[in-house]
C-alpha cells in the first residue's frame, strides 16, 4: 500500500540517520504484500519479497515487524499475534486493529516482553499518543476531543470555500488522494474517527478499551445549505470525536458539531487534524498537524522504531494491562446539547407552530428560528436553534416528524459544541 511503500523508501533513505541516533544497525530482511509485481512509487527488492507473510518468521530472524495492512481481523490480526507470541516487536498504524483487539494484543506484548507501538494509528503525524503516555503522564486527564479525520475535515472546509455540494467535493477529495477512490465510507460515516477516539480514551483515562455502544454519526447528510446557514450564524461544521469522564462514567461520541468561527477548533481546516486534552494540573493542551497520508504516517512509524531501537520496553497503553480498569459507560440518552434542526416543509400556515409545539412537548426549548420561504416550489426551510436538551428528548421528538405530511424530509440534526 501507499504507507508501506513510503515507509520502505524512508527506511532506506534514513538508514544512516537512524543508526547514528540509536547506535543500532538496521536491515530490511523481508517484505510482504498481495502482489509482487504491482507498479509502485518506489522500487522494492523482490529477492526479499514473500507472498505469505507468516513464512517470513520461519525463514528470517526478525526483531521488528511493521504491519501496514489495515484490517481489524484476518491476516492483520493473525500476523501481529504471531509476531508478539514469538517475541517480535510490532509497529502498526492500524487503528481498526488496535481499537478492536488492542487489549488482547497489549497483554501478548507484555507477556512476551516486547513492544507494541501504534503512534501512527491516531492523527497521523501528530505525536498525540506519546504526548499522553509520557509528556502528560502525571496529569489527570478528564477530557480529550478533536478533529481526527482529515478526509471529512477537508470536505467540510472545501464545501464552505468553494460553495460546492458534498458530492462534488467528495469527488475532488478522491482525485487529490484525500479520500479513498473506491469506498470512502469508513471516513465519511465516522467509523475511522470513532476507532481513534476509543484508543485515545484508553490512553487518556488508563482504562481498558470500551466496547459499549456510542453515538456515531458521519457527514453524509450535511448539505451545502447547512454550511451556508452555519456561516450566517458565525459557526462552522466540524466532525468531532469527543471522550470525557462524566460522573465517573465514560462518554464517547463522534458526530458533526457546530462550533464558533472564533474558536480554535473552528479554525482547523483542510486535511489538518487537532487533538485537545483537558486535565490537571496542566489545563488545556493542543496538538495540530496533518492527520493522514503516507508522509505523516511514516513519520510516526519511524518515531516508534527509534523508541524500540533505544531499548525501551513499555506497556503499549502506558501502564500494564492488569492496572488498567474497566469503566461503566455513560448513558448516551442523558447526553445534552443545544441543537440545530433544519426542516424542509410545505409553505403553509400553521406548520411552524406545529413544529414548535412538538418540540415544547418534548421539553425542547427554542432559542432562535430562521425561516426561508421558497414560493416557486411552495415549500420553506425552517431552521431552529434550541437550548440544551437530552438525546432522549430529541430522539423521541424527531420520530414523530416522520409521520407528518407537512414535513417533506426528515429534519437534519447537528449538535452545537461550545
Which residues are covered by each model-predicted region?
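Rossmann-fold NAD(P)-binding glycine/threonine-rich loop
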Residues: 69-86, 93-133
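A conserved regulatory-domain signal marking ACT and ACT-like small-molecule sensing domains
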Residues: 305-418
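N-terminal glycine-/serine-/threonine-rich beta1-alpha1-beta2 phosphate-ribose binding loop
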Residues: 1-85
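Conserved active-site and cofactor/substrate-binding residues in soluble primary-metabolism enzymes
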Residues: 2, 6, 51, 60, ...
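Rossmann-like NAD(P)H-binding beta-loop-alpha module
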Residues: 110-192
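A short hydrophobic/small-residue beta-strand
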Residues: 90-91, 366
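Catalytic, metal-anchored helix/loop core of enzyme active sites in primary metabolism
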Residues: 141-145, 153-156, 178-185, 244, ...
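Substrate-binding/catalytic subdomain of NAD(P)-dependent oxidoreductase enzymes
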Residues: 169-267, 272-274
Amino acid at each position: 500500500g501507499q504507507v508501506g511503500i513510503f515507509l520502505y523508501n524512508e527506511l532506506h533513505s534514513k538508514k544512516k540517520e537512524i543508526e547514528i541516533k540509536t547506535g543500532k544497525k538496521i536491515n530490511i530482511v523481508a517484505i510482504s504484500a498481495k502482489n509482487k509485481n504491482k507498479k509502485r512509487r518506489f522500487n522494492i527488492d523482490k529477492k526479499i519479497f514473500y507472498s505469505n507473510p507468516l513464512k517470513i518468521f520461519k525463514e528470517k530472524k526478525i526483531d521488528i515487524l511493521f504491519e501496514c495492512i489495515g484490517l481489524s481481523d484476518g491476516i492483520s490480526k493473525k500476523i501481529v499475534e504471531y509476531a508478539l507470541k514469538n517475541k517480535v516487536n510490532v509497529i502498526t498504524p492500524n487503528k481498526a486493529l488496535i481499537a478492536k483487539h488492542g487489549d488482547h494484543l497489549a497483554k501478548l506484548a507484555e507477556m512476551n516482553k516486547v513492544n507494541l507501538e501504534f503512534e501512527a494509528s491516531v492523527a497521523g503525524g501528530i505525536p498525540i499518543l506519546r504526548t499522553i503516555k509520557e509528556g502528560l503522564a502525571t496529569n489527570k486527564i478528564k477530557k480529550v476531543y478533536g478533529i481526527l479525520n482529515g478526509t471529512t475535515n477537508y470536505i467540510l472546509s472545501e464545501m464552505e470555500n468553494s460553495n460546492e455540494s458534498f458530492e462534488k467535493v467528495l469527488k475532488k477529495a478522491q482525485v487529490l488522494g484525500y479520500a479513498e477512490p473506491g469506498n470512502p465510507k469508513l471516513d465519511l460515516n465516522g467509523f475511522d474517527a470513532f476507532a481513534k477516539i476509543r484508543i485515545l480514551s484508553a490512553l487518556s483515562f488508563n482504562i481498558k478499551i470500551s466496547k459499549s455502544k456510542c453515538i456515531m454519526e458521519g457527514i453524509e447528510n450535511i448539505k451545502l445549505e447547512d454550511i451556508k446557514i452555519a456561516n450566517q450564524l458565525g459557526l462552522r461544521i466540524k466532525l468531532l470525536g469527543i471522550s470525557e469522564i462524566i460522573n465517573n462514567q465514560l462518554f464517547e461520541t463522534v458526530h458533526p458539531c457546530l462550533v464558533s468561527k472564533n474558536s480554535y477548533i473552528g479554525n482547523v481546516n483542510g486535511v489538518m487534524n487537532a487533538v485537545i486534552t483537558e486535565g490537571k494540573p496542566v489545563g488545556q493542551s493542543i496538538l495540530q498537524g496533518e492527520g493522514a497520508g503516507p508522509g505523516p504516517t511514516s513519520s510516526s512509524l519511524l518515531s516508534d522504531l527509534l523508541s524500540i531501537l533505544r531499548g525501551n520496553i513499555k506497556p503499549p497503553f502506558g501502564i500494564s494491562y492488569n492496572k488498567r480498569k474497566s469503566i461503566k459507560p455513560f448513558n448516551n440518552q442523558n447526553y445534552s446539547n443545544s441543537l440545530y434542526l433544519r426542516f424542509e416543509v410545505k409553505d403553509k400556515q400553521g406548520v411552524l407552530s406545529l413544529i414548535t409545539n412538538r418540540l415544547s412537548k418534548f421539553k425542547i426549548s427554542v432559542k432562535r428560528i430562521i425561516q426561508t420561504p421558497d414560493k416557486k416550489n411552495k415549500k420553506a426551510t425552517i431552521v431552529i436553534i434550541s437550548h440544551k436538551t437530552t438525546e432522549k428528548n430529541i430522539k423521541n421528538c424527531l420520530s414523530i416528524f416522520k409521520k407528518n405530511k407537512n414535513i417533506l424530509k426528515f429534519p437534519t440534526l447537528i449538535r452545537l459544541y461550545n
